[in-house]
Amino acid sequence: MPRPPAKTSLAAFAAFAALGLSACGDSHTKVTTGTYAGESGKNAPYLDVGPLSYEVQLSRELNPVNTEDSTYLQALTPAQRTLAPGQEWFAVFIQVYNHGSQPLPAASNLTITDTQGNTYLPIEPGEGNQYAYRATLVPGNGQLPLPNSVAYDGPTQGALLLFKIQVVSLDNRPLTLKIVDPTDPSETASAELDV
């Protein structure tokens, strides 16, 4: 004769649920390092730098004769536009989130470093480049790029950090993006970039 199904007590179920939820981790854990996971950005970490969170959407080489890529190279001065022998364009597209209610300054100190210690600073295009990352105030409960902006609605949905890097640095991977908090330089985060 079959046994009637056992009744699970509410207390046992609650204990089991609590155990399962405890495995999820603390959603407020500060993340300061990560690895960008590829073109989808699907597994890209949110990097906490001071009170703001940064996420790499995409990182890749740019081809100036490609139609899409040429738009990222708009509003450069002649000196900025010139690549030295052995250099190429490299782009990192990021989003910045402010979960607080007050506007906060976005980082202005962002660099890329290869495994040989070569460090690259971003080039800031002129105002005519609507994709360029600008270290402006991030609105309270807002983000950069701003919703409904060209960069936000663009193919990468991120603001452009534009670099001139040595081609040899692509052999000295991983490349690491470092972000420094503008209000407290001791607060930093870094992410390994996909190439």
Provide a role label for each language-model segment.
Residues 1-22:
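Sec-dependent bacterial lipoprotein signal peptides
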Residues 24-195:
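Conserved functional micro-motifs across diverse proteins
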